[in-house]
Amino acid sequence: MSPRQQPRRIARELALLSLSQIKGSSDKLEQVELNNLVIAAIRTLSGEVQESLETAAAEVSRSQERLLASETRATNLKSAQTMVTEALELTQNAINRLAAMVEIPEMVQLSSQYEVREYALEIIQTVYRRQTEIEQELATVMVDWQLNRLPKIDRDILRIAVAEMIFLEVPQKVAINEAVEIAKRYSDEEGYRFINGVLRRVTERLKTEARR
């Protein structure tokens, strides 16, 4: 992605990572500076890095205990191997978050900063102001799933995409593609595939409603 050509994608990432930390009335949000959005995003990523590393350390410790308990039982060895694999995945996740922490300030500096700030704040304001409608739309298409049971990052990606499609006049295909690309960066394979499926059901429902 060329930062100069993709200010809206950078804005989406900042909005996604800032949603839990940037709150207040529309008037207060209008006063938020771009640097505050960047700091909020980095704090979110930092928290995720710490959580991933702590969980990874716990998995390694548990795997060592299994190995010490019995070096010959196949079930213990297999269990320990699984724990180590999970710890490695968590560590890789932390590394990816650290990379994003380094990249975000640079991307913002190289982009149209005014456009990034304005669109990030527009997304945040819309998600908060239209929260009930957005969540009702998602609940309608999420058969056998509850929004609040999803990982927070996945919930917020869905909220932003629906806000863009319904209230910010972003073409549905663009909103879905952008959501999936961001999910590939901040979620896992299962997460981005699930997000893609949910958003496609949203577009189908919107098209059906439009024909009535």
Swiss-Prot record:
GO CC terms in record: cytosol
Keyword Transcription: yes
InterPro entries: NusB-like_sf, NusB_fam, NusB_RsmB_TIM44
Entry keyword set: RNA-binding, Transcription, Transcription antitermination, Transcription regulation
GO process terms (BP): DNA-templated transcription termination; transcription antitermination
One Gene Ontology term of the molecular function aspect: RNA binding
Any single Pfam family the record assigns to this protein: NusB
Disulfide bonds: none
Superkingdom field: Bacteria
KW Transcription regulation (keyword) present: yes
Similarity comment: Belongs to the NusB family.
Functional description taken from the UniProt entry: Involved in transcription antitermination. Required for transcription of ribosomal RNA (rRNA) genes. Binds specifically to the boxA antiterminator sequence of the ribosomal RNA (rrn) operons.
NCBIfam families in the cross-refs: nusB
Record-given protein name: Transcription antitermination protein NusB
Organism: Gloeothece citriformis (strain PCC 7424)
